[in-house]
Amino acid sequence: MGKYNLTALRVRQIAVAQQSAGKLRQTPKWLDIMHDVPPTEVLVRNRPQQHQLVRQRLKTVPGASRPQAVFEVQEKRIKPKKASRMFQPVEIKYEEDQLRKEFFRDHPWELARPRVLVEKSGKDFERYNWSRLQQRGKHLDGESVVQRQLWLLNNVPDMTKSAAYDIARREFYRLRLQEDIERRVAAEEAEATGAVFGPTRLQIGMDLENKEYERWKEWAKLQAQLSDQRMAAFLGAPEVQAAEEQETSLDDDATEKVAVAA
């Protein structure tokens, strides 16, 4: 075993010594804090805490007038790890992770839509009420479906994950269709009043594809010409070779006629 490096435990002592020697112009603000809360000196490392996945469900209990909230605890399976990874922090998982994975697996093109990731105060979620899918000040996206599905699971009695997913997905399709219709009608109204829009994304993509095809066609023609030139240099010019073969055949015919006449 190598020697223990206890330099981090002596940070305060070194700072005090440097201050008394006049090397520090100003006392560090953390000096008194490290005196009150010194770093641990225990060299035995404990295994990290195993986080549990707690799920809230409303279930109808026989004999009860109202559905009761039931908390289900799912223990995480402890997988054998290498000795070097034994003390690494355990990954924290939430119930939304599986719902989010399932939705974006079924709707991969939702990830291609632009999204706003900047929050004003970091507590924007407190203003949202997921009893309905569409929220004020938030664009409709896949995260709305995930939060709506989670709300249904936590607040509707005897709700299953598949049923909540179908309800949230149906509402999402209806609102997304409404947005597309509103966008199309707004564009038609603007064009009727004289507005001129540029090319759409589909048209831009087709133009880029056509340019790439024309560039490839020119490259293919050039490669074909170079291939023909290399073949001609190896076998000779096709026209000259054909003329030589024809001349040789005529000479052979003449020789045969002379031999027959003799």
UniProtKB/Swiss-Prot annotation:
Pfam families: MRP-S25. It is found in: Mitochondrion. Keywords: Mitochondrion, Ribonucleoprotein, Ribosomal protein. One of its GO terms (molecular function) is structural constituent of ribosome. Residues 242-254 have a biased composition (Acidic residues). One of its GO terms (cellular component) is mitochondrial small ribosomal subunit. Residues 242-262 are annotated as: Disordered. Component of the mitochondrial small ribosomal subunit. Belongs to the mitochondrion-specific ribosomal protein mS23 family. PANTHER family: 37S RIBOSOMAL PROTEIN S25, MITOCHONDRIAL, SMALL RIBOSOMAL SUBUNIT PROTEIN MS23. This is Small ribosomal subunit protein mS23. The lineage of its organism: Eukaryota, Fungi, Dikarya, Ascomycota, Pezizomycotina.
